[in-house]
């Protein structure tokens, strides 16, 4: 069955607008995806008709808002096939989720002389928290290097592990290269050394189904805004055995059981002890609507359509004069490139004049830029609402830029 891309596009009001007098071609969903009416309407309806502070309220609005919030927790647990909804923590996004693990589990379990393994393709959100933890604890940060094609040099991975390796923190899909890492093999190797595994799933969950039980990872984190949901909300999955042992990393309301000026404070049970303060309930409702939306379309159908579009885009872009494409042939979501010796910002500015939105810069992956020896790249990302015609416009725009700039 043909993927109903035009029907999908009709659900996204922003795709109807023009930029610089031309129809918007939004090729920046890896940075943040646009929102369908179903998400916008769900969050708006909550604020119009159902808003109240959650937890402890005895009045109807509070009870209903709390129930709605907890229903999304259950919904998200089914979305990634967690054993229990109580293994899921609401966070502001992937960055906060990783920092939570670093500051809670990491503070308790990392000692001087231990080591943590990451890769050279990580987003800064999966580098900097571990650098900070290692500096604080006197631990070592080890790095899996890259092959020129943008895949990890997995033949080096076994040598990085030893009996002091405590954590493998790895991206599921690179936000620059689109590389999907072979998580089952990597996780199996980590298990041989007794190491825990954190997976940054920010660039994966919108492209295909994720099963955290099948992966057997200890932590999995993703952001709602890349999944066609609101900003400021995400999900951190923590395997239950670890969750119960982890102390809170922020203090305040909602995460306590009792507070006494003389007897100290006791914590709420997990996951609520990791959710200090008033939550982003509207964002949670919107996230639930986003999960409903992609589930109704079918992640397998979304993935098949996006892969067809990706193959077409790579074939067409390869014909642009003087273009450099980065990353493997088999990839998800993104195409990073440079055009001749022109700075990515200049290329992106020209494309914007043509109504085409791409991301330019280091993409929060400065070590990866350094590996390739470039200050920046352009990145076009393909989502379920993008079309062959938009790919053609990108190719035509780049060809025109090459002709103008030489």
UniProtKB/Swiss-Prot annotation:
GO biological process: cysteine metabolic process
Record's subcellular location: Cytoplasm
Protein keywords: Cytoplasm, Lyase, Pyridoxal phosphate, Transferase
Pfam families linked to this entry: Aminotran_5
Gene3D superfamilies named in the record: Aspartate Aminotransferase, domain 1, Type I PLP-dependent aspartate aminotransferase-like (Major domain)
A GO cellular-component term linked to this record: cytoplasm
Annotated positions of the N6-(pyridoxal phosphate)lysine modification: 226
Catalytic reaction(s) noted: (sulfur carrier)-H + L-cysteine = (sulfur carrier)-SH + L-alanine; L-selenocysteine + AH2 = hydrogenselenide + L-alanine + A + H(+)
Pathway: Cofactor biosynthesis; iron-sulfur cluster biosynthesis
Co-factor(s): pyridoxal 5'-phosphate
EC number: 2.8.1.7, 4.4.1.16
Residues annotated as catalytic: 364
Statement: the UniProt record of this protein carries the keyword Nucleus: no
GO molecular function terms noted in the UniProt entry: cysteine desulfurase activity; pyridoxal phosphate binding; selenocysteine lyase activity
Functional note: Cysteine desulfurases mobilize the sulfur from L-cysteine to yield L-alanine, an essential step in sulfur metabolism for biosynthesis of a variety of sulfur-containing biomolecules. Component of the suf operon, which is activated and required under specific conditions such as oxidative stress and iron limitation. Acts as a potent selenocysteine lyase in vitro, that mobilizes selenium from L-selenocysteine. Selenocysteine lyase activity is however unsure in vivo.
Subunit organization: Homodimer. Interacts with SufE and the SufBCD complex composed of SufB, SufC and SufD. The interaction with SufE is required to mediate the direct transfer of the sulfur atom from the S-sulfanylcysteine.
Family note: Belongs to the class-V pyridoxal-phosphate-dependent aminotransferase family. Csd subfamily.
Name this polypeptide is given: Cysteine desulfurase
Source organism: Salmonella paratyphi B (strain ATCC BAA-1250 / SPB7)
């Amino acid at each position: 069955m043909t993927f109903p891309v035009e029907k999908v596009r009709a659900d996204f009001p922003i795709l109807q607008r023009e930029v610089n007098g031309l129809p918007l071609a939004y090729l920046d969903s890896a940075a943040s995806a646009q929102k369908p009416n179903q998400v916008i309407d769900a969050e708006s309806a909550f604020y119009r008709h159902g808003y109240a502070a959650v937890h402890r309220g005895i009045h109807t609005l509070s009870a209903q808002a709390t129930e709605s919030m907890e229903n999304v927790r259950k919904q998200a647990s089914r979305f990634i096939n967690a054993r229990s909804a109580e293994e899921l923590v609401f966070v502001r996004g992937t960055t906060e989720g990783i920092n939570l693990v670093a500051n809670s589990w990491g503070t308790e379990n990392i000692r001087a002389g231990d080591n943590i393994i990451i890769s050279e393709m990580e987003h800064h959100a999966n580098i900097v928290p571990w650098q900070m933890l290692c500096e604080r604890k006197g631990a070592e940060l080890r790095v899996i290097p890259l092959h020129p094609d943008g895949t990890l040099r997995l033949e080096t991975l076994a040598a990085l592990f030893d009996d002091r390796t405590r954590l493998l923190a790895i991206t599921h899909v690179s936000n620059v290269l689109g590389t999907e890492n072979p998580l089952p093999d990597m996780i199996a190797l980590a298990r041989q050394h007794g190491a825990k595994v954190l997976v940054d799933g920010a660039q994966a969950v919108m492209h295909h189904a994720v099963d955290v039980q099948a992966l057997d990872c200890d932590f999995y984190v993703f952001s709602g805004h890349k999944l066609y949901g609101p900003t400021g909300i995400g999900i951190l999955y923590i395997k239950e055995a670890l969750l119960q042992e982890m102390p809170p990393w922020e203090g305040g309301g909602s995460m306590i059981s009792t507070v006494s000026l003389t007897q100290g404070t006791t914590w709420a049970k997990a996951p609520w002890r990791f959710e200090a303060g008033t939550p982003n309930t509207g964002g949670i409702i919107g996230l639930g609507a986003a999960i409903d939306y992609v589930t109704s379309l079918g992640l397998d159908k979304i993935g098949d359509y996006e892969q067809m579009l990706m193959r077409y885009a790579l074939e067409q872009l390869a014909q642009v004069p003087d273009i450099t494409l980065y990353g493997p042939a088999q990839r998800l979501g993104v195409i990073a490139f440079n055009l001749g010796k022109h700075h990515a910002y200049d290329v992106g500015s020209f494309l914007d004049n043509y109504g085409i939105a791409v991301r330019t810069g280091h993409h929060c992956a400065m070590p990866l830029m350094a590996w390739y020896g470039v200050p920046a790249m352009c990145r076009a990302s393909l989502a379920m609402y993008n079309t062959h015609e938009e790919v053609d416009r990108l190719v035509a725009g780049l060809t025109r830029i090459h002709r103008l700039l030489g």
